[in-house]
Regions:
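Conserved beta-ketoacyl condensing-enzyme motif
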Residues: 62-80
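Flexible, glycine/proline-enriched loop segments at strand-loop-helix junctions
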Residues: 41-45, 115-119, 164-175, 187
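Single conserved hydrophobic/aromatic residue that forms the stacking wall/gate
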Residues: 180-192
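Thiamine diphosphate
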Residues: 74-150
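Phosphate/pyrophosphate-binding betaalpha-module
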Residues: 128, 134-179, 183
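Conserved active-site and cofactor/substrate-binding residues in soluble primary-metabolism enzymes
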Residues: 49-54, 65, 94-98, 107, ...
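Iron-sulfur (Fe-S) cluster-binding modules
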Residues: 1-42, 48-68
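Glycine/charged-rich beta-loop-alpha catalytic/anionic-binding loops adjacent to active sites
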Residues: 30-40, 78-89, 110-113, 161-167
Length: 192
C-alpha cells in the first residue's frame, strides 16, 4: 500500500478518518465491568486513551493486528487488555521486558509490544528494560510517562519533574533523574 492510497481524498473523508474507531480496538469494553461499555475507565486528562488509539491505528494501517501481542504490566497499563483486540499477557510489576523477550524469542513472527507506565518502567522495571535494550531484543516498548504514580493516587515517581509537587512530595521534587541520559549507553536506535 502506498502513501497516496492511505491519504484522505477530501476534507470530509479526513474528518471521518479522525473519528473512525480503529479495528484493533474493541467496539465496546465489557471486561471493565461498568455500565457504560463504550467509554474507557481512565481519569480525565489521562493520555492512555489517545495512546491506545494511536497504537491501534498503526496496527490497522500496517495490517499486523493478528501478529501483535501486548504486554501489560501492573499499573494503569494493565488495563490495555480491556481495549486492544490482539494477544495480551499481563505481567508482574517491572517484568514486562522479560515476558516480552520470552514471547519474542519463542514466537518469531509475533510483534511484541510492551506498554509500560513510569512506575513500572522507570522504577521497579528499569534494570530489565535497560538490559532488554542492551541485548537488542525484538520488542517495541511504549513508555507512558505521566510523571506520577497515577493509579495509586499521584505519588512521586522516578520521572516526577524537578519542582513538581505530588501527594508524597508536597514541596516539589528535588534532583533530576533523566531516563534518556540513563539509556544513552545502550546505543538504541531511537530514544525520545
Amino acid at each position: 500500500m502506498d502513501e497516496k492510497s492511505l491519504a484522505p481524498k477530501n476534507l470530509e473523508d479526513y474528518e471521518l478518518s479522525i473519528r473512525k474507531r480503529p479495528e484493533s480496538i474493541y467496539p465496546s469494553f465489557p471486561r471493565k465491568g461498568e455500565t457504560n461499555q463504550t467509554t474507557t475507565h481512565y481519569c480525565a486528562g489521562c493520555g492512555h486513551g489517545i495512546i491506545h488509539k494511536l497504537i491501534a491505528e498503526c496496527m490497522d494501517e500496517l495490517g499486523i493486528q493478528e501478529r501483535c501481542v501486548m504486554i501489560s504490566p501492573v499499573g494503569c497499563s494493565v488495563f490495555a487488555y480491556y481495549y486492544f483486540n490482539c494477544g495480551n499477557v499481563q505481567t508482574a510489576h517491572g517484568r514486562a521486558p522479560a515476558v516480552a523477550t520470552g514471547i519474542s524469542r519463542a514466537e518469531d513472527n509475533a510483534i511484541v509490544m510492551s506498554y509500560q507506565g513510569d512506575g513500572d518502567l522507570a522504577s521497579i522495571g528499569l534494570n530489565e528494560t535497560l538490559q532488554a535494550a542492551n541485548r537488542g531484543e525484538k520488542i517495541a516498548v511504549f513508555f507512558v510517562n505521566n510523571t506520577v504514580y497515577g493509579m495509586t493516587g499521584g505519588q512521586m515517581a522516578p520521572t516526577t519533574l524537578v519542582g513538581e509537587k505530588t501527594v508524597t512530595c508536597q514541596t516539589g521534587r528535588d534532583p533530576d533523574l533523566s531516563l534518556i541520559h540513563i539509556s544513552e549507553p545502550t546505543r538504541l536506535g531511537m530514544i525520545s
